[in-house]
C-alpha cells in the first residue's frame, strides 16, 4: 500500500469521524456545557442575591436591636423615675405623718402637763387649807407655826 492512499483513507475516515462527532456527540456535549454554565451563573446570582439579602437582614437586625435598646433604655429610665417618685412621695408622706404624730404627742404631753398642774394646784390648795386649819386649831406659837410651815413646804 502506498502512503498517499493510506493518508487519503485516513483523512476520509477522520472526516467521517469528525462529521459523526459533530452530528451526534458535539450537540449533547455543548448542551451539557451550556447547562453547566447556566447553573453556575444562576448559583453565582443566587449567592450574590443571598449576600445582598444577608447584608439587608443584618442592617435590619441592627436597626431593630438599636430600637430595642433605645426602648429598653427609655423603659428603664421611666421605671427609675417612677421608683424615685414613689420614694419621694413615701418620704413626704412619712414626714407629714411623722409631723402629725409629733403634734399629737405634743398635744397629749401638753394636756397631761396641764392636768398634772391642775392636780398639783388642787393638792397645794388642800395642803394650804389643812395647814391653815392646823395652825388655827392649835394655839399660836411661832416655833410651832414655823415647823408646820416647814413640813408643809416639804410636802410640796
UniProtKB/Swiss-Prot annotation:
Protein name: ATP synthase subunit b
Source species: Psychrobacter cryohalolentis (strain ATCC BAA-1226 / DSM 17306 / VKM B-2378 / K5)
CDD domains: ATP-synt_Fo_b
UniProt record similarity statement: Belongs to the ATPase B chain family.
Lineage, opening ranks: Bacteria, Pseudomonadati, Pseudomonadota, Gammaproteobacteria, Moraxellales
Quaternary organization: F-type ATPases have 2 components, F(1) - the catalytic core - and F(0) - the membrane proton channel. F(1) has five subunits: alpha(3), beta(3), gamma(1), delta(1), epsilon(1). F(0) has three main subunits: a(1), b(2) and c(10-14). The alpha and beta chains form an alternating ring which encloses part of the gamma chain. F(1) is attached to F(0) by a central stalk formed by the gamma and epsilon chains, while a peripheral stalk is formed by the delta and b chains.
Transmembrane segments: 11-31
Keywords assigned: ATP synthesis, Cell inner membrane, Cell membrane, CF(0), Hydrogen ion transport, Ion transport, Membrane, Transmembrane, Transmembrane helix, Transport
Any GO CC annotation of this UniProt entry: plasma membrane
Localization per Swiss-Prot or TrEMBL: Cell inner membrane
Listed Pfam families: ATP-synt_B
Origin: domain of life: Bacteria
Role: F(1)F(0) ATP synthase produces ATP from ADP in the presence of a proton or sodium gradient. F-type ATPases consist of two structural domains, F(1) containing the extramembraneous catalytic core and F(0) containing the membrane proton channel, linked together by a central stalk and a peripheral stalk. During catalysis, ATP synthesis in the catalytic domain of F(1) is coupled via a rotary mechanism of the central stalk subunits to proton translocation.
Keyword Membrane: yes
Gene Ontology terms for molecular function: proton-transporting ATP synthase activity, rotational mechanism; proton-transporting ATPase activity, rotational mechanism
Keyword match Ion transport: yes
Topology with respect to the bilayer: Single-pass membrane protein
